[in-house]
């Protein structure tokens, strides 16, 4: 299949040093030091009033047990409490109880305890689990613990618990690999989709395109656009944005605008982010007028510019020393409730110093202070030099007015 060939050929050229070893390993058994901690927790647990009901003989329904465990503030008490609960006649573990314990352990970064819970679950096999349970577990290992290899093991271990992953869990792992720039591993996971019973969807293809773009394989990413009909999916704005960004970063604006035209032909409306990518790319290459035209074009299309859009145009005007136009743009932004950046204020002040535009500089400095920015010493020195060098009768008056800010 073209899709697999593209991903394989593209990822095989990425830097192997970026790749992380993802060997499969069994569930970790608690070490002796962890056992000592467990024993100590058991001793302290016995005196916790919040868990007193577990020591009573009254019958406890699963929702009552859940409330008891939810009230536990010290997560080190959870495993001793669970062990005590497992010896009761009304012992009936649920997914909600396991999820609650795992979440508390995750927040406390007690990953060995999570492994102990998973070992217990696998041995007992007393309840069924939803995909959401494993998705949350992968999120904890992938996002909180930074253990991507363990998150992958959870994905492939789901069928052992009678639960098959959907594209949601599968795509989460792919996105995790892209975010970590582990491009070599993407193909290994992708080709396992049939084994896991996962159908490739638009989101999956979007993640692959994003990964290929970030690894510099724009041509392979571009060819993936042809795979959408094969997978009975339709590309969306999230498909095109990484491609447009990639071509803009390489200065290939002709290809970027061709993609914009393709979006319009396929009736995919570009959003503010798409236009911002193009405007920013044009600005960085000094093509300010084209950026301004694009700003007007997006307004005509009914796409509302955001502060980032105007900020990019403002940067472009300042880079070209078009200070009066930049001041007008800044004035409009402020009147619309937007806050220009400190860098734009700094560039504006220094630019006005060069042209000795004292009146305009006075206005900019006041707006800058109103927005909570404090001009640095060097900036004040430039301002003073500018005012004094005017060498006219108004110099002292201008200096007094500006320093009164």
UniProtKB/Swiss-Prot annotation:
Superkingdom of source = Eukaryota
Where found in the cell?
Mitochondrion
Q: Where is the signal peptide?
A: none
| Gene Ontology, cellular component aspect | mitochondrion
One Pfam family cited in the UniProt record for this chain: PPR_2
Q: InterPro entries, from UniProt?
A: Pentatricopeptide_rpt, PPR_P_subfamily, TPR-like_helical_dom_sf
Keywords, A to Z, come to:
Mitochondrion, Repeat, Transit peptide
Where the PPR repeats fall, as residue ranges, is 94-124, 130-165, 166-200, 201-235, 236-270, 271-305, 306-340, 341-375
Region (Disordered) residue ranges read 13-44
Q: Where is the transit peptide?
A: 1-37
Family assignment?
A: Belongs to the PPR family. P subfamily.
Q: Which PANTHER family match?
A: MITOCHONDRIAL GROUP I INTRON SPLICING FACTOR CCM1, PENTACOTRIPEPTIDE-REPEAT REGION OF PRORP DOMAIN-CONTAINING PROTEIN
Q: What is this protein called?
A: Pentatricopeptide repeat-containing protein At3g14580, mitochondrial
Organism (species): Arabidopsis thaliana (Mouse-ear cress)
């Amino acid at each position: 299949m073209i899709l697999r060939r593209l991903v394989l050929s593209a990822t095989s050229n990425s830097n192997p040093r970026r790749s992380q070893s993802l060997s499969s390993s069994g569930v970790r058994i608690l070490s002796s030091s962890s056992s000592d901690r467990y024993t100590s927790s058991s001793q302290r647990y016995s005196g916790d009033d919040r868990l007193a009901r577990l020591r009573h003989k009254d019958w406890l329904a699963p929702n009552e047990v859940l409330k008891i465990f939810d009230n536990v503030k010290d997560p080190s008490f959870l495993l001793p409490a669970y062990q005590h609960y497992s010896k009761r006649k009304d012992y009936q573990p649920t997914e909600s109880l396991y999820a609650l314990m795992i979440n508390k352990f995750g927040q406390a970064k007690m990953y060995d305890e999570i492994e102990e819970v998973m070992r217990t679950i696998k041995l007992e096999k007393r309840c069924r689990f939803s995909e959401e349970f494993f998705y949350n577990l992968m999120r904890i290992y992938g996002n909180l613990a930074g253990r991507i290899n363990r998150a992958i093991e959870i994905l492939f271990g789901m069928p052992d618990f009678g639960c098959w992953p959907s594209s949601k869990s599968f795509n989460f792992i792919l996105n995790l690999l892209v975010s970590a720039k582990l491009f070599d591993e993407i193909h290994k996971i992708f080709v396992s989709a049939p084994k896991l019973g996962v159908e490739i969807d638009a989101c999956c293809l979007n993640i692959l395109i994003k990964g290929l773009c970030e690894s510099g394989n724009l041509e392979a990413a571009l060819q993936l656009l042809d795979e959408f009909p094969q997978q009975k999916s339709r590309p969306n704005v999230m498909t095109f944005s990484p491609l447009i960004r990639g071509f803009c970063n390489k200065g290939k604006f002709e290809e970027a605008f061709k993609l914009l035209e393709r979006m319009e032909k396929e009736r995919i409306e570009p959003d503010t982010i798409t236009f911002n990518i193009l405007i920013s790319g044009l600005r960085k290459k000094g093509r300010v007028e084209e950026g301004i035209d694009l700003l007007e074009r997006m307004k005509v299309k009914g796409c509302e510019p955001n502060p980032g859009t105007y900020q990019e145009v403002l940067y472009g005007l300042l880079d070209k020393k078009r200070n009066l136009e930049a001041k007008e743009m800044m004035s409009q932004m402020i009147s619309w409730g937007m806050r220009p950046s400190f860098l734009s204020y700094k560039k504006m002040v220094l630019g006005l110093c060069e042209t000795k535009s004292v009146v305009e500089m006075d206005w900019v400095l006041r707006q800058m202070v109103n927005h909570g920015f404090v001009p640095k010493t060097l900036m004040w020195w430039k301002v003073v030099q500018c005012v004094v060098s005017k060498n006219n009768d108004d110099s002292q008056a201008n200096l007094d007015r500006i320093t009164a800010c």
